[in-house]
Amino acid sequence: MEESKEEVHVAFFPFMTPGHSIPMLDLVRLFIARGVKTTVFTTPLNAPNISKYLNIIQDSSSNKNTIYVTPFPSKEAGLPEGVESQDSTTSPEMTLKFFVAMELLQDPLDVFLKETKPHCLVADNFFPYATDIASKYGIPRFVFQFTGFFPMSVMMALNRFHPQNSVSSDDDPFLVPSLPHDIKLTKSQLQREYEGSDGIDTALSRLCNGAGRALFTSYGVIFNSFYQLEPDYVDYYTNTMGKRSRVWHVGPVSLCNRRHVEGKSGRGRSASISEHLCLEWLNAKEPNSVIYVCFGSLTCFSNEQLKEIATALERCEEYFIWVLKGGKDNEQEWLPQGFEERVEGKGLIIRGWAPQVLILDHEAIGGFVTHCGWNSTLESISAGVPMVTWPIYAEQFYNEKLVTDVLKVGVKVGSMKWSETTGATHLKHEEIEKALKQIMVGEEVLEMRKRASKLKEMAYNAVEEGGSSYSHLTSLIDDLMASKAVLQKF
């Protein structure tokens, strides 16, 4: 059987931002562990991190699993050299140009598929053109879906029934019809449609709108989720999609590192703190005594909001780890005077990239203040850690509803309005401090921890042999082997 698997060659095309690329690379590792040949299509500045991460479990003498590097179209898109990931952009205008660059990868992808002749292509949902290009060579294209079944079900219900049109105010709640649970939202919380009429904005519009179509036109969709987490919504999604639905749930993919400490610390960019120092700090703390605060790779709060967060962390008198984007350059504009001296020993500030899975998995972590990105949400669930939910953009308000209303393992901080990565709701330190205390002390959090612990157990069971996600990955590989025999020849 292993010999047959080696004959199957799977190509991967990750979208170039950590929230999308990291889980896809976890998926690559899962395929490698099953003996499948893999090739990752990427660009020069992204290649070193990919190579480092995948080589953690690879035999360095083997060339079965490779990286195909194509030049990044910086000049053509109007980007400066060195910007090859969305989280490296520094303005909305630069972000839009980055999406132009993503669209300009169509011809290089065509060349890649023609040269490497993989048996299938797994491409991020943000590359709708991948389906047509792969089809030219008789290659089935799979979508790697970067959200869960619950947020996808919410989007489908909103698009089908348009309940948001029944309210007169952006702040009036409405019930999302047809879902298994009573889910209420406001217009202010809805994911914004990316619309553009000309120029740079058109590329973003095409990619985002095409992402929805890709779910219908691709060979199938791979979800980073597991059945036991959201069974009602797996069923809702597949029933709504009907015959068009070929779905595999193979998550949580981050658990590919569950037996590799170096894998937990090596995901994404090089961490801004050593694994040793991070664990040494955490090992000195009691179980469930530390709050972890991180808002993902794209969130940019105002100086005023950062100051409120700092004040809340100091006043709540709990141990904390706070991940800040970037260095100390502008901290004098908002960091309370003497803050670091006053919280020394109590607070650990990580400036830059943090080994999030390593941190969340530590028994000292008692709560996670999160933007509710799907990866962070799933990683917290996999670690059995309750959350303080602070959604900002994308589908994060939908993920918050899953955490707080369905799974009941989170406390809302009070974010109410969708925005472009900056946080439209300005929250005072009193509100933040209240949520921090709710997630760390009292009877309510004890019940949350019990539920979170049960979800962690379910997550681990799902990826072990015989579990739902393990079995779905086996089914996916078997389907690839079966389809390989009938693929068109070059």
Swiss-Prot record:
Keyword presence, Ribonucleoprotein: no
Residues reported in the UniProt entry to bind UDP: 297, 353-354, 371, 375-376, 379, 393
EC number assigned by the record: 2.4.1.-
Pathway(s) per entry: Secondary metabolite biosynthesis; terpenoid biosynthesis
Application in biotechnology: Soapwort saponins possess anticancer properties and are also being explored as enhancers for endosomal escape in targeted tumor therapies. They may also serve as precursors for vaccine adjuvants.
Main EC class the enzyme belongs to: transferase
Gene name of the encoded protein: UGT73M2
SUPFAM superfamilies reported for this sequence: UDP-Glycosyltransferase/glycogen phosphorylase
Record keywords: Glycosyltransferase, Transferase
Any GO MF annotation of the entry: UDP-glycosyltransferase activity
Tissue: Mainly expressed in flowers, flower buds and young leaves, and, to a lesser extent, in old leaves, stems and roots.
Protein name: UDP-glucosyl transferase 73M2
BP GO terms, sorted: glycosylation; saponin biosynthetic process; triterpenoid biosynthetic process
Role of this protein: Component of the oleanane-type triterpene saponins (e.g. saponarioside A and saponarioside B) biosynthetic pathway, leading to the production of natural products with detergent properties used as traditional sources of soap.
Lineage top rank: taxon: Eukaryota
Active site positions, chain numbering: 20, 124
Keyword field contains Ribosomal protein: no
Similarity annotation: Belongs to the UDP-glycosyltransferase family.
Organism: Saponaria officinalis (Common soapwort)
